[in-house]
Amino acid sequence: WVWEQYDHIIGGNTFQRPGGDAAVVRVLDGPKGLALTTDVTPRYCEADPFEGGKQAVAEAWRNLTAVGAKPLALTDNLNFGNPEKPEIMGQFVGCVRGIAAACQALDFPVVSGNVSLYNETQGRAILPTPTIGGVGLLDDFSISVTLAFKAEGEAILLIGGAPGWLGQSLYLRDVCGREEGAPPPVDLAAERRHGDFVRGLIAAGQATAVHDLSDGGLLVALAEMAMASGIGAELEALSGHLPHAFWFGEDQGRYLVTVAAAQAVAVLEKAAKGAIPAQRLGRTAGNALILPPERPILIATLVRRFEGWLPSYMSGGAA
């Protein structure tokens, strides 16, 4: 709803509009494209500034990768409270160190930025918010992919592991009413391996849809892919996992990828050879999310709930 209030197709060069992992714009009249994204998770930064700083950079890197772009550089917008308070300065230092560690590990340099301090209301500071704006390059913008499912009958693959980290997750906060625990750790070496693998699938034309996993975890990402397309998903029954942790854990360095059913085995074998954790979750099908043994959730219901609440809230209706 927010980005729809503004002109986001100036000059007619917008190839992928906002609303996905990254927007893509064409560079002049040639084949190249630029992908752009902004990311930060303030609750992670408050719980562990160093890991939160790493995660902000890593998520921007993932979002660019998810559309097929090679991440080039970033700008940081560091928003904090009063640095004269030791705890706020500690947040600032920790986040900056985390950002630096991620930039070095991912070859993703900071080329500009700004700092906004003393952000308080009645002496209460904002959450530490080191926003990362990332840009990536596509040699051919036409090969970029989106998060929307493309056709029924395709295999849905999870790239990256599934430990089920619930600390500081939306599930823990919004369902359990608890804001506690450490945020998910960011393994920068794994982040790079997994992202390079996914980018290779896109370049080879094997990936038909890609979405990185972040807020809300696996099931939220699946719902977003389904809502973007109107195509549902039949998911396989879990074995050996706690359902709430598997579906809502916010572990880092992960992607959902769809491929043609005939290519699924080859992609999984390729992942295994590269020591990339990967598994099949199910297939695209129908008009609902089917998660045994739970009742199906119609995509139309998800779209109505997801797209309707903010316009209603902004117009004075019920939240």
Q: Locations of the language-model features?
A:
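Long hydrophobic segments that form regular secondary structure
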Residues: 1-23, 27-35, 41, 53, ...
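Glycine-rich phosphate/pyrophosphate-binding loop regions near the starts of catalytic domains
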Residues: 1-164, 170-177
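Glycine-/charge-enriched secondary-structure boundary and capping motifs
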Residues: 31, 95-102, 106, 111, ...
